[in-house]
Amino acid sequence: MAQNSVFFPDEFLAQMREALPAHLSFDAFIAACQRPLRRSIRVNTLKISVEDFLALVSPYRWQLTPVPWCAEGFWIEREDEDALPLGSTAEHLSGLFYIQEASSMLPVTALFAEDNQPERVMDVAAAPGSKTTQIAARMGNRGVILANEFSASRVKVLHANISRCGISNVALTHFDGRVFGAALPESFDAILLDAPCSGEGVVRKDPDALKNWSVASNLEIAATQRELIDSAFHALRPGGMLVYSTCTLNRDENESVCLWLKEQYPQAVEFLPLDSLFPSATEAVTPEGFLHVFPQIFDCEGFFVARMRKTAVIEPLPAPKYKVGNFPFAPLKGRETAQIVAAAQKAGLQWDENLRLWQRDKEIWLFPVEVETMIGKVRFSRIGMRLAEVHNKGYRWQHEAVIALANDANTFALTHTEAEEWYRGRDVYPELAPTSDEVVVTYQGFPLGLAKKIGSRLKNSYPRELVRDGRLFTVHDSAN
C-alpha cells in the first residue's frame, strides 16, 4: 500500500513518544500515520435496516468490513471508486448511508452505552453532521437534538446532511458553545462535546495537518476546551451523561481536560469506564477508563473519548443578559391542524406525536415537542422541518418533509435511468404516467422528491442546490 508523506514536527514526535503506552510501538505509530485512511460508512437506520442495506448493495461487489464499535458501521472497498464517487451512489443520495470515519462513530456509541435512552440531547459542535445524524438514528427521530455549530459557513452543510438523512427531531443553533451552560442550565439528558482540537489524529486523511502545530497552540486550544466542557457540564441535568471527544492525541487536550473538570466539581463528576464498550476496547483504554485510540490500534484515525455522569447539582452560572427576541412562530390547533394532517395524508406524508405543527406567515413547520421548553431561552437558526407553504389552492409540500415523512400511499417508482435524470434536475417522461396529479417519486423504494404530472411529463421539484452532474449510481446496479 502506498504511503503518505506526512509532516511531523520534532516536538510532536517527542510528545508522542511520551504519550504512547508501553505496549504500543513508536515505529508502528509512525507507520500507521503514513498509511492512507480506510474509507468507512454508517448505515442510516432511520431509512433502512443494516440487513436490508447489505442485501440492497450485494450486487455491487462492495467489500464491507464491520466496524467493531458501531453495528451500523462498515469499512468499504469498491472496485469502481475511481469511476464513481461514493457520494454519487443512489444509496448515498437518498440518505441510506453516511460517509463517516470509523473512529468518529465511537463518541455516539459511548453516549448510548448501557442502554442509555436520552430524550433531550445536545451536540455542542455538530457540523458537518456525522454525529448528529448518528444520534438521531439511535433516538429513532424521537425526543430532540439541539445541534449547535459556531461556524456560520458549516451550518448550511449541517442542515443539508440532516435533511438528506430524513431527520425531523433536530433544532439548529449558531453560537459559541460556551453560552449553553448559562442559557440552558440542567436542560439535557445527554451531551456530546466533540471539541475543536489540534487535529493530530487526522494525518492519515490530511498529511499536512501538523504544518501549523505547536505546543503553545495546543495549550491555547485546551484552555478553550476547558471552558466548553464546563459550559456543557452546567447544561447537563443531574444524572445525565456527557461524552467528551477529540480527534487529537496529546494529553493536554484530552485526559487533562477531563481531569480538570473533575477537579472543579469533585462531588459531581463520575468517570464511566469504556473498557467494555466493544470487544478489544481494552487495547485503547487509559488508567482513567477513557479511550485513547492511537491509529495503529484499530487501523483508523487517532481519537479520544471520555464518558462521565453528572452525579449532583452544581452552582449555576450567572443568568445571561441578552434578549432572545420575539419568537415568530405560533402553534396550530384544532381545525387548522386537522385540515393540514388530512391534506398531508392525501399527499402521502405522515408523522407521529413527537412532532407538532407551527406556523410562520404562510409557512407550516413541524417542531419536535421536546424543544418547546427551550423556546424563549435561546435563538434558534432552524427547528424541525418546513412541512409546507400555504397557497390559494392548498399546500405546497417541501422537499425535506417529503424525504422524511413519505409513506407508500402516493408513490411512483422511477427506473434507474429516470432516477438519474431526477437527480440531475431534469423532468422525467415515464412510459406509463401515474394516475395522480402529484406523486412522491421513489427509487429502490425510497423517496426522491415530489413530482407534478403535466401531460406525460413529471415536473422535477428537486432543489437546485442539490442537483448533481456527471456520472451517478453504481456500475454494478442490476436493477432498472
Curated annotation (Swiss-Prot):
Gene3D superfamilies the record matches:
3.10.450.720, Vaccinia Virus protein VP39 (3.40.50.150)
The protein's annotated catalytic reaction(s) are: cytidine(1407) in 16S rRNA + S-adenosyl-L-methionine = 5-methylcytidine(1407) in 16S rRNA + S-adenosyl-L-homocysteine + H(+)
Family matches, as CDD domains:
AdoMet_MTases (cd02440)
Give me the segments passing through the membrane: none
Where is this gene product found? Cytoplasm
Which InterPro entries does its entry note? Methyltr_RsmF_N (IPR031341), MeTrfase_RsmB-F_NOP2_cat (IPR049560), MeTrfase_RsmB-F_NOP2_dom (IPR001678), Nol1_Nop2_Fmu_2 (IPR027391), Nop2p (IPR011023), RCMT (IPR023267), rRNA_ssu_MeTfrase_F (IPR023545), RsmB/NOL1/NOP2-like_CS (IPR018314)
**List of residues binding S-adenosyl-L-methionine:** A125, A126, A127, P128, G129, S130, K131, E149, D176, D194
Instruction: Look up the EC number in the record and give it.
Output: 2.1.1.178
* GO biological process assignments: rRNA base methylation
Q: Which UniProt keywords apply?
A: Cytoplasm, Methyltransferase, RNA-binding, rRNA processing, S-adenosyl-L-methionine, Transferase
Q: Name one GO cellular component term.
A: cytoplasm
Q: Name one GO molecular function term.
A: RNA binding
- Which sites are catalytic? C247 (nucleophile)
What task does this protein carry out? Specifically methylates the cytosine at position 1407 (m5C1407) of 16S rRNA.
Q: Which HAMAP family match?
A: 16SrRNA_methyltr_F (MF_01579)
UniProt family annotation: Belongs to the class I-like SAM-binding methyltransferase superfamily. RsmB/NOP family.
Please identify the protein, giving its name as recorded: Ribosomal RNA small subunit methyltransferase F
Q: Which organism is the protein's source? A: Enterobacter sp. (strain 638)
Q: Organism classification, top ranks?
A: Bacteria, Pseudomonadati, Pseudomonadota, Gammaproteobacteria, Enterobacterales
Gene encoding this chain? rsmF
